[in-house]
């Protein structure tokens, strides 16, 4: 708001007090004139502010979409829920417990016979592999990571707030670097780092149905800092070795939802201009992040050249995790997390990308992915072209069965 606008607002308020105490047509006319001027000035200042704000979002898609969401009406929190027997929850504690049980039901049951070979945790011996030896966690690196923490974020179950860690970055850097190095070199993660407070976020549908909520984990900020250090080295390794598929646009540097759409749209319009038809299949996986098999993910991590104590550390990071659901300060009982990559963690999205990374190798049709959202398409001129697309869909079905990531048929569409 400009100084001119603030000055006119004070004048408007003064004229209103005069009109209130000495009511007359003249006084009201003076007040009305300034009031209308203030309305125009405020509208002008708001427009200018939005223009400056939108200009600052250039190249920052995440901030832009966050701003758009902030303008929309925020959905209410968890309401009264109804369980499978038609019973309505009466307290926040009951709602938290019901949601916790609902989240537990989607987990993938691991095959006890499917064990990862012990030698995978051995030291790095070949080029194209990465182990704990490639990650040097110095006090300087830790301090820089602590200073990047956002103070407005929430803490995990340990109640160590990011504001505290950021303010004490210089003092915490040395002890934390020692803890991080010991954790990495032993391939173990402290059990306190594997706890999560889960916030249920409503998606769509009936708010009384617990199945219409998704879990987002609030985990230890201390652990998140270490995750960020490990993640940066993993991304560097994957980019250097060319392991990540170019079809993936989710959570990757220089690729976004927009690049995904533009590349697909250009391909489709080019085909149409050349006289082809285009059949597109939009695919979605059911509870994708929560149903990732840990043992199968560890196999894929090894396939990407992740070995040694680093491989063990990620394995320990994923296993024996526990979570509890919170609803307005009331919590459910702690329950073990049997599968999935924790939503809300730093490493989770990257681990999921690695899990679905080989998907394009199973088909011949064109494909684009944004995390778990997948679309495949083919140029159609004769019947056989459609048959090829169907064979690719069947192949993806076999991939789904092998890796235990099931299709959400309700969200799969054909265009």
Where do the language-model regions lie?
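Catalytic palm subdomain of template-directed nucleic-acid polymerases
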Residues: 288-304, 374-401
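Conserved catalytic palm subdomain of right-hand nucleotidyl-transferase polymerases, strongest
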Residues: 152-160, 209-218, 259-302
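Short amphipathic alpha-helical coiled-coil/interface segments
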Residues: 5-13, 28-46, 61, 103, ...
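Active-site palm subdomain of RNA-directed nucleic acid polymerases
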Residues: 230-248, 349-377
């Amino acid at each position: 708001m400009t100084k001119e606008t603030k000055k006119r607002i004070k004048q408007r308020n003064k004229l209103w007090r005069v009109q209130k105490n000495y009511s007359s047509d003249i006084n009201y006319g003076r007040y009305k004139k300034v009031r209308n001027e203030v309305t125009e000035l405020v509208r002008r200042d708001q427009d200018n502010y939005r223009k400056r704000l939108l200009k600052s979002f250039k190249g920052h898609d995440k901030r832009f979409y966050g701003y758009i969401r902030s303008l929309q009406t925020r959905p209410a929190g968890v309401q009264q829920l109804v369980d499978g027997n038609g019973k309505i929850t009466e307290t926040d504690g009951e709602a938290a417990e019901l949601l916790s049980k609902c989240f537990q039901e989607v987990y993938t049951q691991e095959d006890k016979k499917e064990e990862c070979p012990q030698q995978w945790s051995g030291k790095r011996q070949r080029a194209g592999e990465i182990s704990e030896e490639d990650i040097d966690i110095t006090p300087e690196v830790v301090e820089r990571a602590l200073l990047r923490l956002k103070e407005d974020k929430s803490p995990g179950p340990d109640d160590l707030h990011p504001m505290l860690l950021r303010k004490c970055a210089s003092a915490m850097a040395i002890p934390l670097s020692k803890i991080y190095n010991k954790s990495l070199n032993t391939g173990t993660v402290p059990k306190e780092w594997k706890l999560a407070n889960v916030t249920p976020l409503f998606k769509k549908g009936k708010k009384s149905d617990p199945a219409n909520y998704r879990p987002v984990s609030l985990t230890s900020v201390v652990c998140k800092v270490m995750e960020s250090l490990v993640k940066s080295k993993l991304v560097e390794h994957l980019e250097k070795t060319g392991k990540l598929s170019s079809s993936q646009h989710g959570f990757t540097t220089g690729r976004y939802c927009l690049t995904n759409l533009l590349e697909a749209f250009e391909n489709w319009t080019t085909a149409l201009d050349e006289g082809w038809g285009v059949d597109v299949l939009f695919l979605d996986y059911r509870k994708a992040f929560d149903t990732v098999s840990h043992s199968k993910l560890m196999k894929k991590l090894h396939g990407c050249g992740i070995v040694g104590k680093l491989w063990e550390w990620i394995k320990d990071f994923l296993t024996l995790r526990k979570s509890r659901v919170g609803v307005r300060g009331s919590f459910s009982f702690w329950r073990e997390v049997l599968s999935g990559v924790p939503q809300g963690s730093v490493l989770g999205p990257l681990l999921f990308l690695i899990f679905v990374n080989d998907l394009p190798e199973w088909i011949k049709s064109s494909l684009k992915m944004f995390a778990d959202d997948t679309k495949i398409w083919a140029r159609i001129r004769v019947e056989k072209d459609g048959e090829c697309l169907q064979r690719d869909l069947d192949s993806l079905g076999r991939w789904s069965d092998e890796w235990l990531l099931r299709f959400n048929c309700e969200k799969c569409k054909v265009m």
